[in-house]
């Protein structure tokens, strides 16, 4: 039986003879159903029309994407033996070893089970987002709390926000030892790469409340890092990233609580 993949978000579902009646990920207000309605494909069909894009981002960090762009269009990152976030096209030629897969939030779960089976890897997902797993597997381990250590140099940090279990990965050895945050779009690097933003729903432009931004800001303030890599090839902050995230949180709070930055003051 095929494991159907949603064309709009890239989420893979448990094998079935017929496609699911809909995609809960896309029916949620944080995503959307495509203008042409619900459409499905499979990993096998995807391999016939798409290929992997692999690039070194910095020493020790490799980006993995899909071309032409498919679904949300994010790219994954490989560091040490960790695959951070996921892309729908599984390709065992792009990296040598994956022991652990960790994902920032459900929009990037995609084909995590296929990747885990191909590399004999475990998958770490925050338990707060358990309901969004569309293809259960014994390889999936749900972690709880605010932090989960993967190795001496890698740690998962729950930031929440976009999803309750929204996670970033702290890579302590990155940026020549100054520290890197792999953020997905939990911290969304915007077009002006001196800033990030935060949203409950990006495609539908639904903001987060002030209390959640203040909480996220407090967590970020406790971390040591100088660089951020977001979910897309061109979205990163090369230096002074922590200060820029904190400044971005302050700007966001000004905009939603006092109207500053919106021409209201």
Please describe what each predicted stretch is:
Residues 68-96:
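A glycine-rich, hydrophobic loop/mini-helix early in the fold
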Residues 2, 60-62, 73-77, 165-167:
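Short beta-strand micro-motifs in enzyme catalytic cores
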Residues 106, 128, 233:
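Short, ordered loop/turn segments at secondary-structure junctions
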Residues 2-21, 28-32, 45-60, 81-90, 99, 113-164, 206-221, ...:
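Metallo-beta-lactamase
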Residues 72, 91, 108, 212-213:
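Amphipathic coiled-coil/heptad-repeat helices and related helical stalk/stem segments
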Residues 88-125:
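Active-site metal-binding motif and surrounding structural segment of the metallo-beta-lactamase
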Residues 2-60, 64-65:
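N-terminal juxtadomain amphipathic helix
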